[in-house]
Amino acid sequence: MSCMPISTKCNDIWVDFSCTGPSLSELQKKEPKAWAAILRSQRSQQTAEDDTIIGSICDKQGLCSKNEYAYSQYCACVNSGTLWAECAFAPCNGNKNAYKTTEHRNILTNKQCPSGLTICQNIAEYGGTGNISDLYQNFNCNSVINTFLINVMNHPFLTLILIILILVIIYRLMSSSGGKHNEDKLPPPSLIFSNLNNF
C-alpha cells in the first residue's frame, strides 16, 4: 500500500501516520536494509548506519525520504517533526514498527523524557521563532488541547546558553560596582568564553 504524502516539507507537523505502508515481510523484499534496521530498532540495537539507512525527509536520503514511505508507520518518529515524539507522540511512541533513531533510543533508555507528558495522537498547533521552532506545541489528547512548554533544562544547548547569560550578568554587575584597582576587575567576557573552550 502506497503512503503518498501531501507535503514533503522538512519538519512539517503531520497530523497522523495512519497509513501502515507495506507489511514487514513486503518491506523485507523491497527494502531489506531498512527492514533489518527496523528489526534492530525494535531490539534497541540500532546504529548510526541504521539511522542513515532509514533517513528522513529532512535528511533527503534513506527509506523515509521516499514518497511511498514518508507517511508510513515506519517513519512516524523521524518524519513527524514533533517535539519529544519518542516520548509523547502515539504513532511513534506506541508503535514498535516506527523506527527510533539512536538519539531516540538514548532518550528512552536514559529516561530523559520530560515529566508529565501525555501520550497524544496528533499535534494541533505549534509555534516559536528562529532556531527554537519547538518553543511550544499543542497536543491533541483525547480531544483536549494540551499546550506543552519546553523546560529549558531539558535542552542541553539552551542550558549552556542560560549559564553563559548568567555569567555575563554577574560580570556586568561586578564590573559596574567599580573596583578600585585594575587587579580587582574580572577579565573581559571574551577571555572567559575562550577559557570555556579549553574544557
Curated annotation (Swiss-Prot):
- Record text on subunit structure and interactions: Interacts with host PYCR2; this interaction results in autophagy activation.
User: What is this protein's function per UniProt?
Assistant: Essential for viral fusion with host endosomal membrane and core release. Not required for virus morphogenesis and egress. Induces complete autophagy through the interaction with and down-regulation of host PYCR2.
Protein name listed in UniProt: Inner membrane protein E199L
- The species is African swine fever virus (isolate Tick/Malawi/Lil 20-1/1983)
Recount the UniProt induction comment for this entry.
Expressed in the late phase of the viral replicative cycle.
Subcellular compartments: Virion membrane; Host membrane
Q: Which GO terms describe its cellular component?
A: host cell membrane; membrane; virion membrane
Q: Where are the transmembrane segments?
A: 150-170
Covalent S-S links between cysteines: none
Decide whether keyword Glycoprotein is in the record. Answer: yes
| Record's keyword terms, sorted | Activation of host autophagy by virus, Disulfide bond, Glycoprotein, Host membrane, Host-virus interaction, Late protein, Membrane, Transmembrane, Transmembrane helix, Virion
PTM text: Contains intramolecular disulfide bonds.
Q: What family is this protein classified in?
A: Belongs to the asfivirus E199L family.
Q: Name one GO biological process term.
A: symbiont-mediated activation of host autophagy
Membrane protein topology class: Single-pass membrane protein
Residues with glycosylation annotation: 131
